[in-house]
């Protein structure tokens, strides 16, 4: 959660806010409803110095998730409520890549983005292609979430996405969940596997 904010923002927004705190120019791209809750999300980002001028407005719902904290022997549980959100229902036509990438040198996204919906998977691939066409560095934090998509679907989509990624951030769970990598292999074997893929 962002310090001093009642709204909890995760994933790419935290990356943008963290960079803005180090005086790095950041721009956040998403689609949010044009109502009070959507505006609150925009304002929350803006207050930290994040450029929100490319946020697309439309749709009715904002995607959310609930975090049930661990108690006693019950593990932490995340409940996603993102189906039907403005972001999940976004289309390729919503995003003007010339405007979005104008002056950009780096494009970062989370692996949660293409997991949100088939539309977002297609849009993520298109965004990566458009960034690469412009010579922009592309980075991805895989963030595999089995509650959002199967390993098979994640593998299919992320294998395509990663063709355009310069820097891929992952932990062993991400590598196993998305690419089926055997985390018990030696570093030499892992590196050879990654290079082959």
Regions found by a protein language model. Name each.
Residues 1, 99-100, 160-161:
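Structural alpha-helical scaffold elements that stabilize or flank donor/cofactor-binding regions
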Residues 1-4, 9:
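Single conserved hydrophobic/aromatic residue that forms the stacking wall/gate
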Residues 14-25:
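Alpha-helix C-terminal capping segments
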Residues 25-111:
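Conserved N-terminal subdomain of the carbohydrate kinase-like
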Residues 86-88, 113-122, 145-155, 189-192:
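Active-site glycine- and acidic-residue-rich loops that bind
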Residues 130-137:
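A short helix->loop->beta-strand "cap" motif at the edges of active sites that frequently abuts
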Residues 138-140, 168:
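Hydrophobic faces of well-ordered beta-strands that scaffold small-molecule active sites
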Residues 148-197:
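Conserved phosphate/ATP/ADP-binding segment of small-molecule kinases
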């Amino acid at each position: 959660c962002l310090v001093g904010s009642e709204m909890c923002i995760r994933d790419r927004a935290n990356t943008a806010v963290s960079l803005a705190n180090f005086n790095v120019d950041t721009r956040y791209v998403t689609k949010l409803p044009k109502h009070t809750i959507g505006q609150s999300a925009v304002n929350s980002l803006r207050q930290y110095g994040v450029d929100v001028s490319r946020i697309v407005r439309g749709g009715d719902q904002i995607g959310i998730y609930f975090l049930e904290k661990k108690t006693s022997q019950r593990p932490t549980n995340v409940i996603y409520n993102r189906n039907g959100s403005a972001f999940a229902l976004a289309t390729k036509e919503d995003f003007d890549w010339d405007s979005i990438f104008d002056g950009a040198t780096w494009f970062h996204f989370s692996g949660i983005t293409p997991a949100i919906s088939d539309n977002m998977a297609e849009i993520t691939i298109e965004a990566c292609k458009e960034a690469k066409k412009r010579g922009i560095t592309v980075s991805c934090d895989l963030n595999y979430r089995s509650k959002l998509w199967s390993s098979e679907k994640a593998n299919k989509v992320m294998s395509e996405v990663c063709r355009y990624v310069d820097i891929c951030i992952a932990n062993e769970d991400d590598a196993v969940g998305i690419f089926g990598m055997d985390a018990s292999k030696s570093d030499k074997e892992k590196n050879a596997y990654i290079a082959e893929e």
